[in-house]
UniProtKB/Swiss-Prot annotation:
Its EC number is 2.3.1.191. It is an enzyme of class 2 (transferase). The keyword Acyltransferase applies. It catalyses: a UDP-3-O-[(3R)-3-hydroxyacyl]-alpha-D-glucosamine + a (3R)-hydroxyacyl-[ACP] = a UDP-2-N,3-O-bis[(3R)-3-hydroxyacyl]-alpha-D-glucosamine + holo-[ACP] + H(+). Homotrimer. This is UDP-3-O-acylglucosamine N-acyltransferase.
Amino acid sequence: MNKSYSLREIVSTLGGELLGKDDVLISRVASLANAQPGQISFLTDSKYRSVLATTNASAVILTPQNRDITALPRILTDNPYAYFAKVSDLLNPKPEYVAGVDDTAVIAPSAQVPASCTIMAKAVVGANVVLGEHVVVHPGCVIGEGVEIGAHSVLHANVTIYHHCMIGERCNIFSGSVIGGDGFGYAPEEGRWVKIPQVGRVVIEHDVDIGANTTIDRGAIDDTIIHEGCKIDNLVQIGHNCRIGAHSVIAGCVGIAGSAVLGKHCRIGGAAMILGHLEIADGVTVSPGSMITRSLMKAGTYTALMPFQSHDEWLRTAAGIRRLGELAERVKQLEKQLAPQQVSGIQRDK
């Protein structure tokens, strides 16, 4: 059951400026449209002002510029969305794990597992693994030989961490993810493929979240590196030798081919594709569904996707695109034909 906090307690803990009654109790967060008494919401987009006028929320979070748009008790802050996230975290504390090792877990004798760790049923911790304080390993996880995991990190059910990978502190890796499987490396020889041993690691720095069923391949020679603060959604594939810059976010179903390098604070929309060996500058946003086929050396938003149409309209558009080369050639020929006439006309004018 959620614990309730007064607005006064919330502001005392998280900061911000409080207007209105300070003893209002808040037990949950909610959207403006669905909020009920005892719940708090937020407003950042002016198009939802009409919803604010009819909300049943007991309080709202606003920017200082919007301080007078409602009579509801309100907390003023420069970033209402981030403040809302912090309130939600306050009202929904993380579960308290009981330290210890389940009887069905398998722990190698050489593994270093502090007494503060929680190792749940049927987890496997391999030889020479080093776990930090308060690491939580949920049921069915497999941690390979020589893996290091920093303090307060959590592996959810059925996560696999392959040998010698490194996970930083306060990381969350959700169910079904595989860290450090072999990269897709094969050399052609006489019509066959020769497997290239993948001898690098995956190195994940502090404060990284990795969604369910995401795969991050180990490097062929150099390490695959996910820098601090990155947030990666479900069903993402990151190829071998990639480097993802600090505090970048990658939405679901993205594929990043091997040896691509993303800068800091990049935003990659869902189902986007980034080809291998490309470099993406700091601060780049890639729109959902886009295919990036060349390096992007300047911050900004990039889109490589045809907007949707009805099927018949799309067929006509596609047919037109296929004819662009032909049309360009026809225009070029027409320009050549017109050029002598234009010169002749100029001479007559003289």
